């Protein structure tokens, strides 16, 4: 029996990503696909690909073939606004930005304020709408192209419900229950919701690519069962690993456990104190033993954060690994360096977040892609 669990709502234990590929029936992101990405974009690959933070896919090979043939593709991702965003939430958006820039494609970002109202008992609809605005500022701060990006909030972009109806007609309860584990206690809004989440995959008559954490994959499995019957492509996806919280390599960073997370709106000084107090290290019990035996970067959250986001230079990362194993580097040194980088990131992000307040209207309503979507009629196959 596996000692980890991954669902769209819960991640527990130390995840074995190779086993997860088998469980979910996805494919590994191979060296060949990574090299093909570099060849087609003529760009240096970001660390998310080089270090296999994105490790699994569905039909990414077909996405690259579509791009090479001139058919193109589009990107779709999203955010469920149930509270403030933390570093674990934002990292996949940086990978999405790289894909948008280097393939020069449209991006649709769904803000699911309706979903979080349905799935979170303690949240009112006003709460999720308020968090939607706050989360949108963080997303805009990443630096997407405002004319090629449409950020839409489900409670406002009600056309999504019209598009969801024919999709809902294709999904019976047993299909939804098999994927999501719904039961007699599940609210009827929750049972309908997968149709709304699938609707943006039909925004264009091209293949859709979804960059997302692997726990979100079940939503797209259903879409792949019926997309072709509506005259569209099965959606493709590339899956990321999880960013661990400060206190453990198990599970993922969680907003429900504040000591595990660094929030994007945290005061940089307070974030530093949090890292110093809570970040798990792979060091020995004493400095003497650390010097003699070396540390264990494989068991260290601090090293993992450097690997995932905060050390872009591969050679410097490997030197950090070597110095840790050799006992030349102490946990205190590593923590201090990580704190400096996290604080620098937060200061830059928060400055861009403030600037994003003036850009919300363009991303949601007046940018080229936004206007096109507000003006566009419901696609013919989704009117039946």
UniProtKB/Swiss-Prot annotation:
<keyword id="KW-0648">Protein biosynthesis</keyword>
<feature type="short sequence motif" description="'KMSKS' region">
    <location>
        <begin position="252"/>
        <end position="256"/>
    </location>
</feature>
<protein>
    <recommendedName>
        <fullName>Tryptophan--tRNA ligase</fullName>
        <ecNumber>6.1.1.2</ecNumber>
    </recommendedName>
</protein>
<keyword id="KW-0547">Nucleotide-binding</keyword>
<feature type="short sequence motif" description="'HIGH' region">
    <location>
        <begin position="81"/>
        <end position="89"/>
    </location>
</feature>
<dbReference type="InterPro" id="IPR020653">
    <property type="entry name" value="Tryptophan-tRNA-ligase_arc"/>
</dbReference>
<dbReference type="Pfam" id="PF00579">
    <property type="entry name" value="tRNA-synt_1b"/>
</dbReference>
<dbReference type="InterPro" id="IPR002305">
    <property type="entry name" value="aa-tRNA-synth_Ic"/>
</dbReference>
<dbReference type="GO" id="GO:0006436">
    <property type="term" value="P:tryptophanyl-tRNA aminoacylation"/>
</dbReference>
<dbReference type="GO" id="GO:0004830">
    <property type="term" value="F:tryptophan-tRNA ligase activity"/>
</dbReference>
<keyword id="KW-0067">ATP-binding</keyword>
<dbReference type="InterPro" id="IPR001412">
    <property type="entry name" value="aa-tRNA-synth_I_CS"/>
</dbReference>
<dbReference type="InterPro" id="IPR002306">
    <property type="entry name" value="Trp-tRNA-ligase"/>
</dbReference>
<keyword id="KW-0963">Cytoplasm</keyword>
<dbReference type="GO" id="GO:0005524">
    <property type="term" value="F:ATP binding"/>
</dbReference>
<keyword id="KW-0436">Ligase</keyword>
<keyword id="KW-0030">Aminoacyl-tRNA synthetase</keyword>
<comment type="similarity">
    <text>Belongs to the class-I aminoacyl-tRNA synthetase family.</text>
</comment>
<dbReference type="InterPro" id="IPR014729">
    <property type="entry name" value="Rossmann-like_a/b/a_fold"/>
</dbReference>
<dbReference type="GO" id="GO:0005737">
    <property type="term" value="C:cytoplasm"/>
</dbReference>
């Amino acid at each position: 029996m596996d000692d980890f669990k991954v669902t769209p709502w819960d991640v527990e234990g130390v995840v074995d990503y190779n086993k997860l590929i088998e469980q979910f029936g996805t494919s590994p992101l191979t060296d060949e696909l990574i090299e093909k990405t570099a060849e087609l974009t003529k760009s240096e690959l970001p660390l998310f690909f080089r270090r296999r933070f994105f490790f699994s896919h569905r039909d990414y090979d077909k996405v690259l073939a579509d791009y090479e043939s001139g058919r193109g593709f589009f990107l779709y991702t999203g955010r469920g606004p149930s509270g403030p965003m933390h570093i674990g939430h934002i990292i996949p958006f940086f990978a999405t930005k790289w894909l948008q820039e280097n393939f020069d494609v449209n991006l649709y970002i769904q803000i699911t304020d309706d979903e979080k109202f349905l799935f979170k008992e303690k949240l009112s609809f006003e709460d999720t709408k308020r968090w939607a605005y706050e989360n949108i500022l963080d997303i805009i701060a990443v630096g997407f192209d405002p004319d090629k990006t449409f950020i839409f909030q489900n409670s406002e972009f009600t056309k999504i419900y019209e598009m969801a109806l024919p999709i809902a007609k294709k999904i019976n309860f047993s299909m939804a229950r098999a994927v999501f584990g719904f039961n007699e206690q599940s609210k009827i809004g929750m049972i309908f919701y997968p149709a709304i989440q699938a609707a943006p995959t039909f925004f264009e008559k091209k293949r859709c690519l979804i960059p997302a954490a692997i726990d979100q994959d079940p939503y797209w499995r259903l879409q792949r069962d019926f997309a072709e019957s509506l005259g569209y492509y099965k959606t493709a996806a590339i899956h990321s690993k999880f960013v661990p919280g400060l206190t453990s390599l198990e599970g993922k960073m969680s907003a429900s456990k504040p000591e595990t997370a660094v929030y994007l709106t945290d005061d940089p000084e307070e974030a530093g104190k949090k890292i110093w107090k809570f970040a798990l290290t792979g060091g020995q019990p004493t400095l003497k033993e650390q010097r003699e035996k070396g540390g264990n970067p494989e068991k260290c959250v601090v090293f993992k954060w450097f690997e995932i986001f905060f050390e872009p230079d591969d050679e410097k990362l490997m030197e950090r690994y070597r110095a840790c194993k050799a006992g030349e580097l102490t946990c205190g040194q590593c923590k201090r360096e990580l704190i400096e980088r996290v604080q620098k990131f937060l200061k830059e992000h928060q400055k861009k977040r403030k600037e994003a307040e003036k850009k919300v209207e363009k991303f949601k309503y007046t940018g080229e892609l936004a206007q096109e979507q507000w003006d566009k009629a419901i696609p013919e196959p989704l009117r039946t």
